[in-house]
Each structure stands twice: as structure tokens, then as C-alpha cells.
Amino acid sequence: MKKILVLLVFITSIFAADATIEVVNRGLVLPRILIQDATTNFASSDVRERFSRMIAGDLTVGSAFEVIEGIEKTTYDAPLGAEIAAKNPAFVLRYELAGGSGETMLKVKLIDTKDSSVRFEANYSQSDLKRWPFLSHRAIADIARNLELSPIEWMDKSIVISQYTKPGEARIIIADYTLTYQNVVLSGGLNIFPKWANVEQSAFYYTTHEKGKPTLYKYDLATRQKSRITSSGGMVVASDVSKDGSKLLLTMAPADQSDIFLYDLNTRSAKRITSYSGIDVNGNFVDNDSRVVFVSDRMGNPNIFATSINGGGVEQLVYHGKNNSSVSTWENYVVYSSRESGEEYSQRTFNLYLISTKSDYIRQLTATGVNTFPRFSSDGGSIVYIKDAGSQSAVGIIRVNENKSFSFPVNLGKLQSIDW
């Protein structure tokens, strides 16, 4: 039997205790912000120290401020001291952690140094101490929303990962975007290709093997129950979910060769979209769910194509690169990973590109290394991806509109797939 080409490449895993952020591109002059820690009674000194680095990192990735290096100690209601003038901040972000043994609480306020006015203030709580990174993510996302800055709601979203544990076995992990928080939700057997089921991230689809046959399941995070969706010989993978959550784009291979199918969750029926003797995989909704972007080898090498949600004629979207095998969509935008030829004897290079289905627009997003698994954020303004550069692996975050890129160096391991 001819093997199905799985175009989601095996990538190194991401299990770092703390992420080190590197700003790749710098542009506009941003207002300076000083961080002050007003914590006086918190049970975990380790979490307190790591939280200070996390909130500074979140502000940096948010790309709206220049974060002044170093965290000052103060009390929550203390007036601004004259000593901060030397650092010339436009804002002071002051926070206080409390608890830490059971419920963890966070108070945070943003102070305008011109007149000492409080521009934003809020309280947060988290019952599970292990989820402490989300306190920082939520606060910084709320500040951006309150000040009408570029939206970063994705910061408070989770990433779902499949990680190989040994040959023939993979577990599924829920993590924050820095992968500082990790929670194993499925283990035992082969659990691969997780895909969020809805914008609330209350459930995800994944593929496993049931009696030797690839089977698609839905896992509910609240009830910890799984429900069977469908199965198919060869392979079955949920690559995208419609905006209303009622339909899935599946890659299935009932007759050995993979094609794209539209699966209706209400009627539990599948409609074939592509019918090709080679390989069609990784379908993604685009153009308000009216079309499908997918990867196919119909021109020889894997490349990016599009067709109507009802099937029919196929349009080639990309005309460069030797292997365009990883793709994600948002509205009418497509981000993909493209293998490019470098100098003789040089290491292979996969760069990320952004195109539009409505124009000839194309933008190169990365320049070096092996950059794969691009995934749009929920608002389309950011892209997460996996970056390999020599012996160093990292999670990359691209702020598309801000023209900034960040990398988080990580420890090694083997990652099967990722969804944001």
C-alpha cells in the first residue's frame, strides 16, 4: 500500500521553564513602561520571580510599549517616587500577587506618569497555581483592549499540542502560548493532529487508532469525555473547523489516496471536495468559508492550491518554493511554509510567506532557519510557528501589523503537531 505523505513535519518540542524573548525587528519609537512589583505576601517565591519575567515578556510581545529593563519593588498604593524620573517612563505598570498556596490573586494598575492618573486597574484570580501564566496574559490583553491598542486577546488563549512519547505513542498537551504552563489531557496510545473545536477552546478534535483504523474523536475539556466522530481507512485528520463550528474539513484516504472532505456534524455526513489520484491534504477554510485552501502534489512537489467549497476547478496559489507543505488561513489571508534553495552545501531553509486570495499581495515573514507549522491567532494579527536554526529550536511569534518577530528558545523533544 502506498504510504500517505503526512505534510505536518515532525518538529522539536517546546518545553522551556521560562521563555527568553528576542526582538528580531525594531521599528517605531514606543512609549516606555516601567514595571513595579508590589507583592508583599505570596506563598511561592519561584512563581513570583517567574511572574515578573512573564509580565515583562507579555508587554514586549504586545508590541505597544518599550519595556524598561528591571523590576522595581514598591507597595501597591504608594505614590510615584521621584527616582523613576531618571528612567523616563510614560507609564508604570504596578502589580501585586497574593495567595499562591490555593487561589492565586493578581491586582494590577497602569499609571500615567504625566499626572499619576490610573489609566487601568483590575483584579484577577486563578484557582490552579499551575496556570499562573494566564494571570499575566489576561491582564496585558485587557490593558491593550482598554487602551484601544492592537488586539492581543490571543495571548489569553491556549495552544494544543501532540507530542511523541515513544514509537507509536503520542500525548496531547494544553499549554499557554509560551508553553510555560503545560497540562497533559490525553495519554496512552497514538493521539495526534489535535484541532480546536471552537473559539471558546472548550473541546478539540484529534485522531487516534481504534482497532487498527484511524478514527476521529472530539474531546470535551470540561467533562473529560470523548465522542467518536468518524473513521476512515488510510487516514482521517480534522484540519479546520468552520466559523459556526458545524462543519469540518477532513483529510481522508478511503481508497488509499488522500482527499479533502467536508464533514457536516449535524447530519454526520461527508462530502468529497477534491478527487485526485495523488495527495490532497491539510484543507483550510478561506474567503468566509466559501473556498478551501489545501496542499497537493498535483504539480509534482507539494504546493498550495484552492478550490470552491463545492469542489470543481482548482487554482494554484503559490508559484515559488520547492516544497510548500504547511499552511494556515484567516479570512482571505494565507500563511505557508516554503522550502527554498540556498547556497550549495548550505542547510535547507523553510521560510514563511503571507499572501491574499484577493490580490497579488505577498510578504516574506522569515529569512533564515527552518520555519514551519504557521498558525494564525484568532484575530489574524499574529502568527505562531516553530523555528529551527542550527542546534537551537524556538517558538516564534510574528506580530504581522507591527512588523515585529519574537523567538522563545526551548529545550528539545519531538512535536507531532500544534494548533492555536
Which residue ranges define each predicted feature?
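C-terminal/domain-edge helix-coil "capping" segments
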Residues: A17-L30, S117-R119, N123-Q182
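Multi-bladed beta-propeller domains
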Residues: D176-I192, D220-M235, Y263-I279, T307-N323, ...
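Short beta-strand->alpha-helix linker/helix-N-cap micro-motif
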Residues: E22-E83
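Residue-level detector of Asp-centered blade-edge/turn motifs that repeat once per structural unit
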Residues: W154-M155, N198-E200, K243-D244, D287-N288, ...
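Amphipathic beta-strand/beta-sheet edge segments enriched in Tyr/Trp
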Residues: P79-A139
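A flexible loop/linker signature enriched in serine peptidases of the S9 family
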Residues: T165-A170, T207-T215, S231-G234, T251-I260, ...
